[in-house]
Amino acid sequence: ETGLTITHADHTLTATNPDGSEAWTYERTDADLCSLSTAWGKIVASYKTGVGCGDTVAIEAATGEYDSTRSAVNSEKVVPVSSNDRVGTVSTDRIDLWRSDMVRTVEYGDVEAKQEPDKQPHEDCTISSALTRTENLALTESCPDKPGTTWLRFQDTTPDDSREPDIAADVDIATDGARLVAVGQKAAAVYRPGPHPTIESYDNKGEKLDSTSAEPSP
């Protein structure tokens, strides 16, 4: 898989070798591609079907062989999120993370078709960014009960119950529009906009570690 370039056009994923030759292709004409990630030596592609962007297939990157699939309700528009340990999707409504066998380990946000009530603590919030590294999932979101604030939340990527988030810390950033820019195993950094923008870092216990001035976002 080393050196392969993965592209998508006209319903086809194409893996290209460094010398420009075609390694393999994967075609799917019945659904549009929503997101594309890589992890564990696999290509992970999510497609839009009758359950939103919830039809996901894992393909061996080196050979193009089918590995596994999963299908579940998801948002209509998503972006990929990944680390060496997890792959998933993020939308303004929800976050889903999966391990290498495509079993979901995190379900967070406004979850449709809930099997049990009262599992999600912040269903009415709007997610603005998310990043993950090993056992750390960080996200930012805004909530209607506290306008003008961005919440930075840390949670475990392997909670006891994938349907019930394990929130490690909630950080109240008193600025609208803050976004994650980096994540570590036990910390994260956010860009805080305003007249004097800053990059602020916090550990996963919610303690501020550092704050440095930054250029305004374009």
Which residues fall in each region the model found?
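Repeated scaffold domains used in trafficking and secretory/extracellular systems
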Residues: 1-2, 28-41, 72-85, 115-130, ...
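Beta-propeller blade signature
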Residues: 56-64, 149-160, 199-206
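Short beta-strand elements that form the blades of beta-propeller/WD-repeat-like
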Residues: 2-9, 14, 36-52, 56-57, ...
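Contiguous hydrophobic segments
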Residues: 38, 62-88, 194-218
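Acidic, glycine-rich loop-and-beta core segments that form the ion-binding/anion-interacting portion
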Residues: 159-214
